[in-house]
Amino acid sequence: MAGHSKFKNIMHRKGRADAARSKLFSKLSREITVAAKTGLPDPAMNPRLRLAVNNAKAESLPKDVIERAIKKSQMGDAADYSEIRYEGVAAGGVGIIVEVLTDNKNRAAANVRSYFTKMGGNMGATGSVTFNFDRVGQISYPAKAASEDDMMEAAIEAGADDVTSDMDEEGEGHTVYTAFESLNDVAAALEAKFGAASNTKIAWRPKMQVPVTGDAVATLMKLLDMLDEDDDVQAVYSNEDISDEDLAKLG
């Protein structure tokens, strides 16, 4: 569920695939439960739940797990989750936004703060980082879904604001950005043309990126790892700019 930029920036962090997959499934299930609890338990009538279910399907979350997560929202003993946003700055000046979904606010705050402190960063006040980001709708497709020109044309026709395409073999494919109010309409138009997206969400897009080089790269990536791996953390957004050469040194 991490949101920090460029697929290549996280390729070196794929070693713990099974554990990461288990955590991802847990986070997807939690989002489904919360979405169903805050609205109707019917994806057709609940836009947030529809997005959560579609994203879960794109990640191959089993159908029975999705159904259980929805049913859980209707149980009287279902946990009460709080949605919290933390903001902080890593060593080197990289801004980080951490979105949390937790049943224990004190635990979540203490953990996130400890990660920043341990890696030489600092937690900030609300708004201390988000002013460097735009709140947008984000729709992702693999490169094979369409050519760069076809995706651009379809996205513009659907009302999107911007499209980036990374068509390399290990690239991140197509990312379509919209006003967050238009996300569902644009996503529906693209799905009609290209099929289901690999991910659709409200995201934080950096207005500018901060160059990170040398030893600071490993420190930053360790911090992002720690945040990603926390069970309470649903998404992480950051505005680093790291060269392919520095990423390659991480192994």
From Swiss-Prot:
Keyword terms, alphabetized: Cytoplasm, DNA-binding, Transcription, Transcription regulation
PANTHER family, sorted: TRANSCRIPTIONAL REGULATORY PROTEIN YEBC-RELATED (PTHR12532:SF6), TRANSLATIONAL ACTIVATOR OF CYTOCHROME C OXIDASE 1 (PTHR12532)
Cellular compartment(s): Cytoplasm
GO molecular-function terms, A-Z: DNA binding
Source organism (scientific name): Caulobacter vibrioides (strain NA1000 / CB15N) (Caulobacter crescentus)
InterPro entries cross-referenced by the UniProt entry: Integrase-like_N (IPR017856), TACO1_YebC-like_2nd/3rd_dom (IPR048300), TACO1_YebC_N (IPR049083), Transcrip_reg_TACO1-like (IPR002876), Transcrip_reg_TACO1-like_dom3 (IPR026564), YebC-like (IPR029072)
Keyword Transmembrane among UniProt keywords: no
One GO BP annotation of this record: regulation of DNA-templated transcription
Lineage: Bacteria, Pseudomonadati, Pseudomonadota, Alphaproteobacteria, Caulobacterales
Name recorded for this polypeptide: Probable transcriptional regulatory protein CCNA_03352
A GO cellular component entry from the record: cytosol
Pfam families: TACO1_YebC_N, Transcrip_reg
Similarity comment: family membership: Belongs to the TACO1 family.
Keyword DNA-binding: yes
